[in-house]
Amino acid sequence: MPGLTLGDVVPDLELDTTHGKIRLHDFVGDAYVIIFSHPADFTPVCTTELSEMAGYAGEFDKRGVKLLGFSCDDVESHKDWIKDIEAYKPGRRVGFPIVADPDREAIRQLNMIDADEKDTAGGELPNRALHIVGPDKKVKLSFLFPACTGRNMAEVLRATDALLTAARHRVATPVNWKPGERVVIPPGVSDEEAKARFPAGFETAQLPSNKCYLRFTQVD
């Protein structure tokens, strides 16, 4: 499944991890899961990223969201590297599993291959890909960063909150949205349905087109 993208079902891979063997669909279960790859163990940007993800792990856990890291190094390398990650920012614990994928099969199927980066032997490396997978095993959101650019974990959390809010209330979230702020009502929802669904009411932006498509409401 080299073209894995939004709306696709992730393959039910059998994976070797720092927590033992898992099947991906079983791991997802009824939860949302953040699947994220890093190019290599014992590298600078990856160390800061994994440390930061460990720092945010409690926030994801509060939301019932699981974390699953991916790299091409083996399990023993991952376990040794975790010691460095935890020492870099004392008090942060890497409690989530990290997949070992030395044959590159998992990252190929999850569309995480970097076309430009290679290891010293010329082997393929993953880019900084991140997929948020829903309970239906479908990709709900993807980020794709090059090896030179670390991801923003605060934005990953914000985007996760937006997805969860949209799924729970059947709404959409506007630009720069944060939890607690107003959401927008999708165009396919009539005013009559909106009145029934949103007891707090809604506000329609007055625009030069006189089209009533930008409607804001508040949800819990």
From Swiss-Prot:
MF terms from GO for this chain are:
peroxidase activity; thioredoxin-dependent peroxiredoxin activity
Q: Which residues form the Thioredoxin domain?
A: 4-165
Among Pfam families, the record links this protein to: 1-cysPrx_C (PF10417), AhpC-TSA (PF00578)
Does the record bear Metal-binding in its keywords? no
Q: Which reaction does it catalyse?
A: a hydroperoxide + [thioredoxin]-dithiol = an alcohol + [thioredoxin]-disulfide + H2O
Active-site residues per Swiss-Prot or TrEMBL entry? 46 (cysteine sulfenic acid (-soh) intermediate)
* Annotated GO CC locations: cytosol; nucleus
PROSITE patterns linked? THIOREDOXIN_2
Query: Record's superkingdom?
Result: Eukaryota
Motif interval(s): Bipartite nuclear localization signal: 195-218
What's the family?
A: Belongs to the peroxiredoxin family. Prx6 subfamily.
Miscellaneous notes: The active site is a conserved redox-active cysteine residue, the peroxidatic cysteine (C(P)), which makes the nucleophilic attack on the peroxide substrate. The peroxide oxidizes the C(P)-SH to cysteine sulfenic acid (C(P)-SOH), which then reacts with another cysteine residue, the resolving cysteine (C(R)), to form a disulfide bridge. The disulfide is subsequently reduced by an appropriate electron donor to complete the catalytic cycle. In this 1-Cys peroxiredoxin, no C(R) is present and C(P) instead forms a disulfide with a cysteine from another protein or with a small thiol molecule.
Its function, per the record, reads:
Thiol-specific peroxidase that catalyzes the reduction of hydrogen peroxide and organic hydroperoxides to water and alcohols, respectively. Seems to contribute to the inhibition of germination during stress.
- What this protein is called in its record is 1-Cys peroxiredoxin B
Q: Which organism is it from?
A: Oryza sativa subsp. japonica
